From Swiss-Prot:
Family: Belongs to the UreF family.
Alphabetized InterPro entries for the sequence: UreF, UreF_sf
Keywords: Chaperone, Cytoplasm, Nickel insertion
Official protein name in the record: Urease accessory protein UreF
Source lineage: Bacteria, Pseudomonadati, Pseudomonadota, Gammaproteobacteria, Pseudomonadales
GO cellular component, one term: cytoplasm
One annotated GO molecular function: nickel cation binding
Organism: Pseudomonas fluorescens (strain SBW25)
Functional note: Required for maturation of urease via the functional incorporation of the urease nickel metallocenter.
Encoding gene, per UniProt annotation: ureF
Pfam families listed in its UniProt record: UreF
Subunit structure: UreD, UreF and UreG form a complex that acts as a GTP-hydrolysis-dependent molecular chaperone, activating the urease apoprotein by helping to assemble the nickel containing metallocenter of UreC. The UreE protein probably delivers the nickel.
Gene3D superfamilies, sorted: Urease accessory protein UreF (1.10.4190.10)
Listed transmembrane segments: none
Length: 224
């Protein structure tokens, strides 16, 4: 099978895990005026990419994928604990848990998941997105680097979808923004691959505050 097909499958918005229903604080940033147009949206997404994802979320995901590929189950279990402890708000915790559960349900119904990975999933009754993504990459024979690229693209695509629903930003403007942000995806992937995952730490205060405020936002399009 062409390996590109598996990669496209993992990155597809049709993957039934519900990523489209979350904004990761962006809806609140639009509500309070921090993000009001394409330029401010670019700044918000760039900061999230390079200051949060590249330094913490992406290296953590990469470590999950590497441990799953090598069948290092004790290491993967440790990473699961670190991931769970790093969710700074209830919204982010529930988002990762719900998407991880949906991905677990998907993988359990597919023949590609091997017995060892299936047993590991059965032992972890509280799944999360990074774990599901790593085991999907293992099942579909996707390298950790490619799995990270798919995850970064999926994140960016979802953020742009949020913008088109909350701002007067059309599809062509979103595509122009995509062209501007693609080099940052490459930079985020490279930065993440150079970071030692032992230990990792995050200090994304702006994101945490936006997510906490979003939990109490009066009118919302996206889940909290």
């Amino acid at each position: 099978m062409n390996p590109a097909w598996a990669l496209l499958r993992l990155a597809s918005p049709q993957l039934p895990i519900g990523g489209y229903s979350y904004s990761q604080g962006l809806e609140m940033a639009v509500e309070n005026g921090r993000v009001a147009d394409a330029a401010s949206a670019r700044r918000w997404i760039s900061d999230q990419l390079l200051l949060n994802l590249a330094r913490f979320e992406a290296p953590l995901l990469l470590a999950h994928c590497q441990a799953a590929l090598e069948a290092d189950w004790p290491r993967l279990a440790q990473l699961c604990e670190e991931h769970r402890a790093s969710r700074e708000t209830r919204e982010l915790y529930q988002e990762s848990r719900q998407m991880g559960y949906s991905l677990q349900q998907l993988l359990n119904g597919l023949p590609e998941l091997d017995d060892a990975a299936r047993r590991f999933l059965e032992q972890h009754t509280e799944p999360h997105l990074a774990l599901g993504w790593a085991l999907a990459a293992r099942a579909w024979r996707i390298s950790p680097a490619d799995a990270l690229a798919a995850w970064l693209w999926s994140w960016l695509e979802n953020q742009l979808a949020v913008l088109m629903k909350t701002l007067p930003l059309g599809q062509q403007a979103a595509q122009r923004l995509t062209s501007e942000l693609l080099p940052l995806l490459q930079q985020a992937q490279q930065d993440a691959s150079r970071i030692d995952p032992n230990p990792l730490g995050s200090a994304a205060f702006g994101l945490s505050l936006a997510c906490m405020a979003h939990e109490r936002q009066y009118s919302r399009l996206f889940r909290s």
